[in-house]
């Protein structure tokens, strides 16, 4: 057989396989959360072996470790980082609204208290006359007294 020469000949360029994402020092373990998070998608799904560029054995160990970490609550079942940020913003907005509501309530209460004090002072300054009506038991007559308070 003749060697094929010309434009159809396949080039023999050397290519270098990219480094695996798990280094020799990294352990695939359910407690090693930093390593496990690299292999979970934004939705919280375990990435495929093709995407991860792992060997079959590494992928199996990784799947088991992620599932164990989820069961033991080291990892969430769904990736909620963006959801947590949104919840934090909502929480902050609610706290600010609550602070404003409390300030308004305090101002209203203070205003009402001041109005009550002014009314009480006005009542104290006003001289009122009270009449006490009673029946004198000795004479069986109706007596009235006026008193200043």
Swiss-Prot record:
This is Small ribosomal subunit protein bS18c. Part of the 30S ribosomal subunit. It is found in: Plastid. The keyword rRNA-binding applies. PANTHER family: 30S RIBOSOMAL PROTEIN S18, SMALL RIBOSOMAL SUBUNIT PROTEIN BS18M. Gene3D superfamilies: Ribosomal protein S18 (4.10.640.10). Belongs to the bacterial ribosomal protein bS18 family. One of its GO terms (cellular component) is mitochondrial small ribosomal subunit. The gene is rps18. The keyword Plastid applies. One of its GO terms (biological process) is translation. Keywords: Plastid, Ribonucleoprotein, Ribosomal protein, RNA-binding, rRNA-binding. GO terms for molecular function: small ribosomal subunit rRNA binding; structural constituent of ribosome. Residues 1-23 are annotated as: Disordered. It comes from Cuscuta obtusiflora (Peruvian dodder).
